From Swiss-Prot:
Gene behind this protein: metE
Residues the entry annotates as binding Zn(2+): H650, C652, E674, C735
Pathway: Amino-acid biosynthesis; L-methionine biosynthesis via de novo pathway; L-methionine from L-homocysteine (MetE route): step 1/1
Free-text comment on the cofactor: Binds 1 zinc ion per subunit.
EC number: 2.1.1.14
GO-annotated biological processes: methionine biosynthetic process; methylation
Binding site for 5-methyltetrahydropteroyltri-L-glutamate: R17, E18, W19, K20, K113, W570, E614
Enzyme class (EC, first level): transferase
Name of the protein in question: 5-methyltetrahydropteroyltriglutamate--homocysteine methyltransferase
Species for this entry: Lactiplantibacillus plantarum (strain ATCC BAA-793 / NCIMB 8826 / WCFS1)
Pfam families: Meth_synt_1 (PF08267), Meth_synt_2 (PF01717)
Functional summary from the UniProt entry: Catalyzes the transfer of a methyl group from 5-methyltetrahydrofolate to homocysteine resulting in methionine formation.
Disulfide-bonded cysteines: none
Length: 768
């Protein structure tokens, strides 16, 4: 009897972002369809071959995508919104991308976070849907791997219940009644996919049902069980690996009895609950336990001794031929390899493991389990030495940080006066009109901006020349903002590659990777910083840029910071101390930056917390602790200023109805929220609960290249004003504008100002 290993999914971007560049060249018309598909195939096959070379026994296929796997699923099953047309065949690339990116006449499909991590998926729309199988992509990619590489892969498909539950009908996520209504129409198509795979020789299929971890009652299990019983009965020769991840299964004892041949459990992010279920209830002798023992969305090297001890514990529950070792979730959410991190501190590098290194760890653990540790003793010894060196390093033992942490309990973090008092002082100081306009922070980073930054980083541009260029670009955009008629300006953030990475480069305890790219949405890659040590403030981060921008105009320019929780939610966070401790270290550092901005004369300071909602634990029983920690760290950051300094915050891509009280507890003077793609859900939430502070609900979607009309923006503003007093309301886009083209940005902002002016003229009330 032998233990084997399995992978759940592999990163798409490419080791040097080849996939990203492929998509963007196609969108710009620089590639034809034939070249696109040939290049995409080359990348797919290279990824499969690499996994085979790294010793993966069961290699996933069809986990690749041309944009997003949920989009792939809705396109395959014809859940295509009617505004994009009607189809009876596999979509060509322009039609496929229109759904994700929008067109001049059709608004892009909504995009939101994939569970509680920084990946975005396209939200299916099930209004008047007529399911049919337009493309069995799972069969195509299974056959490709088999024919080209001789790999008998494991097709990966999003399960029918998760597919439905991740989508919306009439603007609302589907409840169980809606799922039960649509499931009979969808199941025959899944059955067809399964049948065609079985006919082609597939032995296993990985059926991802990630929403299963969010079920808490037996009643919620019914549609999952119905689907699995149907599929197994219809295609008994195709073995089903029911894969879950990101948390534990509350109804494990029921789920494990279903007609599946393998159950994939997350043993990393489960709060220890899945392992407790296994110990308490055991595991059926006729199924495979696919044990997710390697962290698939953090970058730390595993403690191989501890992981092998876990494997030995699992061997007390199942036999070796019942045990697969695998990542806890798809490796889509980590960078590809550490081999390109040539500038990293060797002590840090020894503690890192990206996708390829994680697969190597799996192989090592598989060998150790089957042949004994002696077969890989050198690898184990090297692993322990690396982990010890990192944990004992000065990076993780900063005594000044420890002293500051020790004083936290002795301090009260509240603004000096209540909001009603503060806002009057701020109005007197700022002299803003009714319905003030602003943007969220960043402006388009042109090819020239990126080229100058790259040249500077390579040493081909002096510091002085680079600074002169940044000043020129800032000056140009201050003038553009004034000409547009914006009321509160921003400096544009041309010095920043990323709203989190930039801060990581300025604080201790962070490592900015050279090539640690992960997919955020579509072709957009981000390089999350690695928080590997104690975080401390050493010098001003944003003050010089903000002061320079303010010197160019009499209008207020916002200082722009990223809040602690977003920094850790969008970073790879050290796992040797609690996340809340890291969060508070960052807050203490940023508090000094906020105070330095105020001392430099900046009147408005925006502390962005876009990732607050998305980072919520999947199970509600864990929410309150998370939210309390979020409020606490935000207040550490923002409460050290005077009453007439206005604190803004921004949030995006989230459903806020269930955290309105937390938003209020932040006590920000002004909050801006992304709303355009969520079709008014957030407006409804504020209508139900009320909100006293000032607020900007994004009036147009920046994630699409289309330019909204004045009438469209006016309608969005008018809808918000039915719920929110005009004296509280700000006018702004959804999010930052870094990824947009300059022409799109200027046209959209021009229309936004025109819409504001038209509505402003209709209002007789003034807040000043």
């Amino acid at each position: 009897m032998t233990i084997i290993n399995s992978n759940l999914g592999y990163p798409r971007l490419g080791e040097h972002r080849e996939w990203k560049h492929l998509l963007e060249h196609f969108w710009k018309g620089q590639l034809d369809n034939v070249t696109f598909h040939a290049t995409a195939k080359k990348l797919r096959l290279a990824n499969l071959k690499k996994q085979r070379d790294l010793g993966v026994d069961y290699i996933p296929v069809a986990d690749n995508s041309d944009y997003d796997h949920v989009l792939d699923t809705l396109v395959a099953f014809n859940a295509i919104p009617s505004r994009f047309g009607h189809f009876d065949h596999q979509l060509d690339l322009p039609d496929y991308y229109a759904i994700a990116r929008g067109t001049d006449t059709a608004v892009a499909a909504e995009m939101t976070k994939w569970f509680n991590i920084n990946y975005h998926y396209i939200v299916p729309e099930f209004d008047d849907v007529s399911f049919k199988l337009l493309d069995n992509r799972w069969l195509r990619y299974y056959q490709e791997a088999k024919q080209e590489l001789g790999i008998d892969g494991k097709p990966v498909i999003l399960g029918p219940i998760s597919f439905l539950k991740l989508g919306k009908r009439h603007g609302q996520y589907l409840d169980d009644a809606a799922v039960n209504e649509l499931l009979p129409q969808l199941l025959p198509l899944y059955q067809q996919v399964f049948e065609e795979l079985a006919t082609a020789g597939a032995k296993w299929i990985q059926l991802d049902e990630p929403t299963l971890v969010k079920t808490t009652t037996v009643a919620e299990l019914a549609p999952y069980q119905t689907a699995l019983e149907h599929l197994h009965a219809a295609v008994p020769s195709l073995k089903i690996e029911l894969q879950t991840y990101f948390d534990s299964l509350d109804q494990y004892d029921k789920i494990v009895t279903w007609p599946i041949q393998a159950l994939g459990l997350d043993l990393v992010h489960d709060h220890g609950e899945n392992l407790a279920h296994l110990v308490d209830h055991g595991f059926p002798t006729d199924k495979i336990l696919a044990a997710g023992i390697i962290d698939g969305h953090n970058v730390w090297a595993s403690d191989l001794q501890a992981k092998l001890a876990l494997v030995q514990q699992l061997r007390q529950i199942v036999t070796d031929d019942q045990l697969w070792l695998q990542p806890a979730n798809s490796l889509l959410h980590v960078p590809i390899t550490t081999k390109n991190e040539t500038k990293a501190d060797p002590v840090l590098l020894g503690g890192l493991a990206f996708a390829d290194q994680k697969l190597a760890e799996l192989h090592t653990l598989t060998v150790a389990a089957n042949q004994g540790v002696a077969a890989v003793q050198a690898v184990f010894d090297h692993n322990q030495a690396n982990l010890t060196a990192l944990n004992q390093s000065s990076h993780r033992n900063n005594q000044s940080v420890r002293a500051a942490e020790a004083q936290l309990s002795n301090q009260k973090f509240e603004r000096q006066a209540p909001f009603a008092t503060r806002i009057k002082l701020q109005h007197d100081r700022l002299h803003l009109p009714l319905l003030p306009t602003t943007t969220i922070g960043s402006f388009p980073q042109s090819a020239q901006v990126r080229a100058k930054r790259a040249a500077w980083r390579k040493g081909n541009l002096t510091d002085a020349d680079y600074q002169a260029f940044l000043h020129a670009e800032t000056k140009r955009w201050i003038k553009l903002q004034e000409d547009l008629g914006l009321d509160v300006l921003v400096h544009g953030e041309f010095e920043r590659t990323d709203m989190v990475e930039y801060f990581g480069q300025k604080l201790t305890g962070f490592y900015a990777t050279q090539n640690g790219w992960v997919q955020s949405y579509g072709s957009r890659g981000v390089r999350p910083p690695v928080i590997f040590g104690d975080v401390a403030y050493t010098e001003p981060i944003t003050v010089a840029e903000s002061v320079y921008a303010q010197s160019l105009t009499d209008q207020p320019v916002k200082g722009m910071l990223t809040a602690p929780l977003t920094i850790i939610n969008w970073s790879f966070v050290r796992d040797d101390i609690p996340r809340a401790q890291v969060q508070n270290q960052i807050a203490l550092a940023l508090r000094q930056e906020v105070q330095n901005l105020e001392k430099a004369g900046i009147k408005i300071i925006q502390v962005d917390e876009p990732a607050l909602r998305e980072g919520l634990p999947l199970k509600q029983r864990h929410w309150q602790a998370y939210l309390d920690e979020a409020v606490y760290s935000f207040k550490i950051t923002t409460t050290g200023v005077q009453n007439d300094t206005q604190i803004h915050t921004h949030m995006c891509y989230s459903n806020f109805a269930d955290i309105i009280n937390t938003i209020k507890a932040l006590d920000a003077d002004v909050i801006s929220i992304e709303t355009s793609r969520s079709h008014g859900e957030i407006i409804s939430a504020f209508e139900q609960t009320g909100y006293d502070q000032e607020i900007g609900l994004g009036v147009y979607d920046i994630h699409s290249p289309r330019v909204p009309s004045v009438a469209e923006i006016e309608a969005n503003i008018q809808r918000a004003l039915r719920v929110i007093d005009a004296r509280q309301f700000w006018i702004n886009p959804d999010c930052g504008l870094k990824t947009r083209q300059e022409s799109e940005t200027l046209a959209a902002l021009k229309n936004m100002i025109a819409a504001r002016n038209a509505i402003q003229a209709q209002l007789t009330t003034s807040i000043h």
